[in-house]
From Swiss-Prot:
The keyword Secreted does not apply. It comes from Nitratidesulfovibrio vulgaris (strain DSM 19637 / Miyazaki F). Keywords: Ribonucleoprotein, Ribosomal protein, RNA-binding, rRNA-binding. The gene is rpsT. Belongs to the bacterial ribosomal protein bS20 family. One of its GO terms (molecular function) is small ribosomal subunit rRNA binding. One of its GO terms (cellular component) is small ribosomal subunit. HAMAP family: Ribosomal_bS20. GO terms for biological process: translation. InterPro entries: Ribosomal_bS20, Ribosomal_bS20_sf. This is Small ribosomal subunit protein bS20. Residues 1-26 are annotated as: Disordered. Binds directly to 16S ribosomal RNA.
Amino acid sequence: MANHKSAIKRHKQSQKRAARNRAAKTRIKNVVKAVRAAVLQKDKDTAAQALTAAMSVLDKAAGKGVIHWKKAARKISRLTKAVGSVE
């Protein structure tokens, strides 16, 4: 454990940030999984709703620096393409 006051504070801050980032990444995985599941079920309405939610979560995560904005854009693009292919 850190000995200096500032090091102790930084350690606490990094733990809080890590927990927040972990939660955001888990949320991303869950919404992406929901979109992919809807696409596999060939349920266009559910897939479209799940895609809207996924886009929101991905954009928020990118805006907060949890993931890179280009990674978010890439995931959104691929999910949109998958939802578009559902008939």
